[in-house]
Structures are given as structure tokens and as C-alpha cells.
Amino acid sequence: MIVCAAVRLHIDKTNEDVILCGPRHHYIYKQLEGLGFEPNKGYSRVMDGFVTNTGKFLNRTDGLVYAIQVGQVNANIRDEFTKGIKVELYSEDLW
């Protein structure tokens, strides 16, 4: 089960990758501001995605496949995926 939106970031100062979580991706960027980061300074965004209840990070594409497999999205989303219309998951698709 996907439990939160997530962003994988590379922090320049520590040369480490971190994953920040929140209910929606834009809240995560607000967290960065709260931590003193200016937009796109001191870090690079590696990837937007989601975290599962087991702590696994999934990118938007893998997140969509996973959410369909576990029944976490509605029939409209599944149909759009099957038709090739939808290829990425957004938090609005989940909650």
C-alpha cells in the first residue's frame, strides 16, 4: 500500500541521497524551504515518487503499476493505464 508522496533528493553539502515524504509532493518542497534550502540550491531533485508501507520508494511509473496491483486506485485510473493514456501516478489519484 502506498502511504505517502515522496521526493528523492541529492543533498550537495553531504553528497547523500535522502527521501522526504508528505501527503502531496508540493508539501515536500515546502519542507525543504523550512529546512533553509532555497529553490534548486543546495540539492538536486533526483525523482518524484511514493513510499509504500514497507518503506520502498517507487517512482511515478512504478507507483502507478503498484497502486493498480494492490487495488489502491479507481477503475477510471486503471482504464486510462490499460489504454496507455496514463503512465504516471499522482497523489491526487490516491487521495
Model regions and ranges:
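Linear-motif-rich, low-complexity cytosolic tails and juxtamembrane regions
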Residues: 1-48, 52-95
